[in-house]
């Protein structure tokens, strides 16, 4: 059995990774990574460098960096005019993951949010 937990990109640091390892976490998810936001990373190279850095840091603590989690951009799910640019950015995320050796992506497809009854 393997234990996986997630860290917000703002909390990716040696202290948290050492804690995760100490409590028996094996695999790490970063949710959300700093991609796509106005002040975030946008190019494939920027994203790959970030992911490689997290992977190296995780491995130095005996963790495997196995996953990032993202929400589907509204521009894609709602077929907005900026859709094609967001699809290309999404593809660059996947390419950057491949460049960095991050094997899986978790995502939510919720074009109109959550419903509760």
Residue ranges of model-derived segments:
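N-terminal pre-domain/capping segments
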Residues: 1-117
């Amino acid at each position: 059995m393997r234990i996986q937990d997630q860290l917000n990109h703002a909390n990716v640091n040696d202290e948290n990774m050492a804690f995760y390892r100490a409590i028996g976490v094996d695999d790490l998810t970063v949710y959300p990574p700093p991609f796509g936001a106005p002040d975030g990373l946008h190019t494939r190279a920027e994203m790959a460098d970030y992911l490689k850095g997290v992977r190296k840091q995780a491995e130095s603590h005996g963790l495997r960096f196995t996953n990032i989690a993202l929400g589907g951009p509204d521009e894609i799910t709602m077929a907005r005019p900026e859709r094609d640019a967001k699809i290309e950015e999404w593809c660059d995320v996947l390419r950057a993951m491949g460049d960095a050796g991050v094997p899986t992506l978790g995502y939510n497809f919720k074009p109109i949010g959550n419903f509760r009854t």
